[in-house]
Regions:
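Short amphipathic alpha-helical surface micro-motifs
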Residues: 2, 68-70, 197-200
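12-transmembrane solute porter fold
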Residues: 5-175
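Hydrophobic transmembrane architecture of multi-pass small-molecule transporters
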Residues: 132, 138, 150-245
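Flexible cytoplasmic inter-helical loops of multi-pass small-molecule transporters
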Residues: 2-7, 242-244
Length: 245
């Protein structure tokens, strides 16, 4: 705790805004990575998309940010704008994107996800910039390297955790839904040649769709939980070189 030059300065966690930013950063990265993994997994398993086809959809998330990123920076640099509410709007947009995606059916393809991708393109800069402002607003210049260490650690952990959690939950929920669907078939088709195998494939396919919907709703719940955290934890900060009204 009293080490003169620690790699992780635990005392910085006593700053509410920094602690909030680290928690929310981890949550936001979980949401972002999860949305990519769920969507790409669905398109690969149900529509047979290859990686380059999924990458085309990801461009709908990345390229619009070349426009939205500077706009959000200008907005957050306005003293009258409370960046906490910019962050709240961002999380609500992410939750909306997840709820829309949870309505997916086996007929959905990459084109169907474009509106959802555009919502992400707007929401992501609206989350990252306010989080950086909240984290750095009350720090001294000498605290910068220690804060960077915390941010990098959270980023690495969140990305790894999201990938592992989505893979595990997708398999568990997929098996559960596939088993439930298969039980509903009964034995009426068991006498037909090849029917059992066909029904198993159909159950697995529909089970993956339902599992993807479950995961989208779970991620939406995380976004709403982080939105509620904004109401109780962070304090307002102002842009650099601005005077509070």
């Amino acid at each position: 705790w009293y080490h003169p030059l620690p790699f992780f300065n635990l005392q910085l966690l006593s700053k509410r805004n920094l602690s909030f930013s680290l928690i929310t950063l981890g949550g936001v990265l979980l949401i972002m990575v999860s949305l990519v993994n769920i969507t790409s997994g669905y398109l690969a398993a149900i529509q047979g998309y290859r990686q380059e086809q999924t990458s085309d959809l990801m461009l709908w998330v990345a390229l619009p940010q070349l426009i939205t990123l500077p706009i959000v920076a200008i907005i957050c640099n306005t003293p009258r704008v409370d960046c906490r509410w910019v962050l709240a709007i961002s999380l609500l947009l992410m939750a909306t994107a997840c709820v829309l995606a949870a309505q997916l059916t086996p007929e959905w393809n990459g084109d169907t996800f474009r509106v959802i991708a555009l919502l992400q393109a707007v929401a992501q800069p609206m989350a990252i910039i306010p989080l950086l402002m909240q984290a750095t607003g009350g720090l001294l210049p000498t605290d910068g390297p220690f804060a960077a260490a915390w941010f990098n650690a959270v980023k690495g952990f969140a990305a790894t955790a999201a990938g592992g959690a989505i893979a595990l939950l997708s398999r568990q929920r997929g098996d559960y839904h596939a088993g439930t669907i298969a039980d509903g078939f009964g034995s009426a088709y068991s006498r037909a040649s090849g029917s059992a195998e066909q029904l198993a494939q159909l159950a697995a396919r529909q089970g993956h769709v339902l599992a993807s919907a479950d995961l989208y709703l779970l991620v939406a719940g995380l976004a709403l939980l982080l939105t509620a955290l904004i109401l109780v934890m962070p304090t307002r900060i102002y842009p650099p070189r601005s005077v509070a009204a």
